[in-house]
Amino acid sequence: DCFICKSEGFEAQTQIVVSLNGTAIIATLNIVHSNILQACEASLSESAWERLGAKIGDEISLSHLDPVLSLAYVRAKIYGKALTSYQFDSIIQDVVAGKYSNIQLSSFITACGHNHLSTQEIVHLTQAMIKTGEQLHWNHPIVVDKHSVGGIPGNRTTPIVVAIVAAAGLIIPKTSSRAITSPAGTADTIETMTSVSFTAKQIQSIVAREGGCMAWGGALGLSPADDILIRVERVLDLDPEGQMIASVLSKKAAIGATHVLIDIPVGPTAKIRSDFEFLKLQDYFTVVGRELGLHVYTLKTDGSQPLGRGIGPSLEAKDILAVLRCENDAPIDLKNKALSLAAIMLEFGEKAPLGRGLSLATQLLNDGTALKKFMRICEAQGGFKEPSSAALTCDILAM
């Protein structure tokens, strides 16, 4: 309620430029009406404080943000216009620069949703997202990766697959996301057993040591625009098809993968609910991947019911360990799917002849080699810990 804010037309949720000693950031303005701040005083969030290197009593300057010209392209998309590569570059650069408010981000996400992006637009969006982030390079002709479109509870195959594939000698720098529309993302589950937040340099060190990793992609800056968009998508409970493809493939290209397996569960309550939707998504992934220089393989899997027994990070982690430890009561559906995915990757990664991938994957799991590799990767990532159990439990017996 400062008179300066009023005279300048600053309102709540306005995007403004905050400057201190030659450093400037874009911040969202919140206005308080209590006496916690005096006239001509402002407080900063912890992240803004750190980025500016501010100290108590410093004098900051506030100014209006220049007009965000790329918003004109978002408005064009809302009205059904096709966007060019340059226009997507402009939008994504402004998103990463913090020039978009949450409302404006929501409008962009919505404008691109419900099949509003052509294949070429998805290519442009993906390339724009890659340009704004860091890219890793590996001195190997084949670098494999996988992604599950998700949409079904459980389905936590990634740690098992990474362990098997890395144990076979392939390079698999696996990054995963946190939950968007489910109780747990792969990164959330792995975090109950080991650390997942690393810099790009640390990832390179871990992979050089063990051939694979299991990290949270959001800490790497591989596709910073995607991390910003996912934060808003989570609130909206949306995962638009075009942006999902751009999200997945931008991070696969940025991590340095050459061969990527896309697991697409199809079922009545999954994200993909019909063969028609599967074939359309398969075509999108293949065509966009080819434009990026990626060998993309898609696999239709059963999405009619949950996979594994546990739902939530800790319980899903217990399922993973049961499979890796070859326990008698390990969930057979999770085990079989992980083996089938690993088998395909071993074959296109040229570690097994066509049709022999499953036998090699099964051998590596059953003889304990995969478990040893999993533990070694965890140690390289800061050490392994058993996933904890909840303080309170309740047995619910089947009738």
Predicted ranges, named:
Residues D66-P153, K373-Q381:
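Acidic, glycine/proline-rich low-complexity segments that act as flexible tails and inter-domain linkers
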Residues I142-A166, L170-S182:
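Glycine/serine-rich anion-binding loops at beta->alpha junctions
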Residues D1-Y79:
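Long, compositionally biased stretches
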Residues T189-C213, D283-G289, G293:
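A glycine-rich helix N-cap at a beta->alpha junction
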Residues G80-S85, V95, D239, T258-M399:
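Well-ordered secondary-structure scaffolds
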Residues I109-G113, K146-H147, T186-T189, P224-R234, ...:
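Active-site-proximal beta-alpha loop/turn segments in soluble metabolic enzymes
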Residues A208-H259:
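Phosphate/diphosphate-binding glycine-rich loops and adjacent basic-rich segments that engage nucleotide
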Residues P159-I171, K251-G256, E291-L292, F348:
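Alpha-helix C-terminal capping segments
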